[in-house]
Amino acid sequence: MNLEIVFQLTALLFVVAAGPLVIVLLASRGGNL
């Protein structure tokens, strides 16, 4: 496998995982949106 492909997959996984995580953090910190 190419290192560039691995990097792109890692970045994609990071974005997919960070999306809901940021929403949960904002919801828990700010209370109700």
UniProtKB/Swiss-Prot annotation:
The keyword Thylakoid applies. Coiled coil: none annotated. The chain crosses the membrane at residues 5-25. Its main location: plastid. GO terms for biological process: photosynthesis. Belongs to the Psb30/Ycf12 family. PSII is composed of 1 copy each of membrane proteins PsbA, PsbB, PsbC, PsbD, PsbE, PsbF, PsbH, PsbI, PsbJ, PsbK, PsbL, PsbM, PsbT, PsbX, PsbY, PsbZ, Psb30/Ycf12, peripheral proteins of the oxygen-evolving complex and a large number of cofactors. It forms dimeric complexes. This is Photosystem II reaction center protein Psb30. It comes from Chlorella vulgaris (Green alga). The lineage of its organism: Eukaryota, Viridiplantae, Chlorophyta, core chlorophytes, Trebouxiophyceae.
